[in-house]
Amino acid sequence: MKRPLRIFCALLLAHTLRAHSAEPPATLTAEPFPLPGGEGGIGLDDLTFAPGLRQVLVPAGRTGRLDLIDPGTRKLREIGGFKESAPEGGGHGAGTTSVDEGRGYLFAIDRTALRLSVVDPRKGTIVAGAPLGGSPDYARFVAATNEVWVTEPDKDGIEIFALSKADPPVPTHAAFLAVPGGPESLVIDTLAKRAYANLWKSSTVSIDLAARKVVQTWRNGCEGPRGLALDAQGRRLFVGCAEGGATVLDLAHGATLKDSLRFGSGTDIVAYNPALRHLYVPSSKSGQMAIVSVSAQGKLSQIGTVNTAFGAHCAVADDHKQVWICDPRGGRLLVVRDTLP
């Protein structure tokens, strides 16, 4: 090939690559999914996917119910017994707002009653419980220690409940773990036997599950860290930033900041689908959600955008390539089928 032609081909290829990289993200559509009692709004917060039940868990706040949704059929089942209240016009300070799965049971908080409840999903009822020492935020089951950890940000710490070996398990207060300056969010890393939580400003802490103490503090690249999502096999921790967007920490290399992405404003609870390697980043103040591809090296690239709703600050991924997004003001969920590569 002659030199001028080689130069022309190289320039053409470079232009093509630049044009490809500059392509705008695809736009996906969200479908509304009404919740019972949603008229007037529901203070939704912590949505989770229970792999054992293969259901999306929706603690439906002031309605006094925990909603379980089959992502395949989209059938909804309600479990009552939590405190009910009238629409509060914003916030998520009433009823049940966080839940986790463990030992075949569900462990849910009740902000109004200040209780940790044990729910039998087969019977559809609350079967045990214990009083909380403070206002709760997140509940997480810790299989390695047979405990439930409940964050209490107003007390700057985590209340730890030991579970009996009985069936159903009965929770008993066991300890209080101080997390000064936090905790916000909570994820359990079973492989590393660690828990991760954010501080309200710029940092994430690593907690030894057995020792029940903070062992490391990492800068996470956010001004206001909020939600966390764990890629356990990929050894990555994603952090949602209140200023808008997310960052990724490389857990295999000292939790170094691997990459960051800015999107909108008012990001809170992010979600991750490890099969697709997609991160979901809601922007509550713009009423949108970014779909972000995570490369094998941990680099973040926005590949999609979803129009959601103002105030939609939380998301969870299921095992059907769907994302469920909370719409607190609408008292409903929004569902997106992720068809992106």
Please tell me what each predicted stretch does.
Residues 20-341:
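Predominantly soluble domains enriched in secretory-pathway, periplasmic, or organellar proteins
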Residues 2-10, 18:
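Sec-dependent signal peptide recognition
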